[in-house]
Amino acid sequence: MAFLLHQARFYTTVNHLRDLPPTVQPEIAFAGRSNAGKSTAINVLCNQKRLAFASKTPGRTQHINYFSVGPAAEPVANLVDLPGYGYAEVPGAAKAHWEMLLSSYLATRSQLCGLILMMDSRRPLTDLDRRMIEWFAPTGKPIHTLLTKCDKLTRQESINALRNTQKGLDAYRDQGVKGKLTVQLFSALKRTGLDEAHELIESWLRPSVADEKSEPVAQ
């Protein structure tokens, strides 16, 4: 099966909200703690080895990377790689910059149609993960969580991580959050959950295609 995400290429890098590209195509943002495997997951989803780069120093990257998706002449969407968060040794000024950049982008970017939130399956729903949800959830747009590195868990541990994370996400619905909050297991190494993630992301980028597939055929 050919995936739209496999037609991805670097587009631009920005460090301030004023530099965000004036595009009209839908965007999907990828967020997660430093060392949650975000860059690796993006590369696997896009079937490329070096599309998204992970800094050798956790927490060093402070900018937003854009990747265009679709035909090079007429891209149909953008993937947006947000800075990793949660590394303790990052200076306070850098943390403040990240917080402003991430919270403002998530809350105000009209092109943004959904958030892919990476959580280490061994340590899901940290305080900072919850903060990301709370910044974005008021928009009513969907959040899909990838519980990364699930290959490091036993089968029972994976089941428990999935169940407990879904329970934590359901609590936001009880608080009145309108957008969909979903979760799945994911392993870039073992390619666990890859097809499921592909299908969900592409349904966000190409809802008209998904709608057409779901419509009954006229007799």
Swiss-Prot record:
UniProt record, GO biological process: division septum assembly
Keyword annotations: Cell cycle, Cell division, GTP-binding, Magnesium, Metal-binding, Nucleotide-binding, Septation
Pfam families with a match to the protein in the record: MMR_HSR1 (PF01926)
Residues in EngB-type G domain copies: 24-207
GO cellular component: cytosol
Cofactor entry: Mg(2+)
Binding site for Mg(2+): S39, T61
UniProt: GTP binding residues: 32-39, 59-63, 81-84, 148-151, 186-188
InterPro entries listed in its UniProt record: G_ENGB_dom (IPR030393), GTP-bd (IPR006073), GTP-bd_ribosome_bio_YsxC (IPR019987), P-loop_NTPase (IPR027417)
Top-level taxonomic group: Bacteria
Family matches, as Gene3D superfamilies: P-loop containing nucleotide triphosphate hydrolases (3.40.50.300)
MF GO annotations: GTP binding; metal ion binding
Job description of the protein: Necessary for normal cell division and for the maintenance of normal septation.
NCBIfam families documented for this protein: GTPase_YsxC (TIGR03598)
Family: Belongs to the TRAFAC class TrmE-Era-EngA-EngB-Septin-like GTPase superfamily. EngB GTPase family.
Name by which UniProt lists this protein: Probable GTP-binding protein EngB
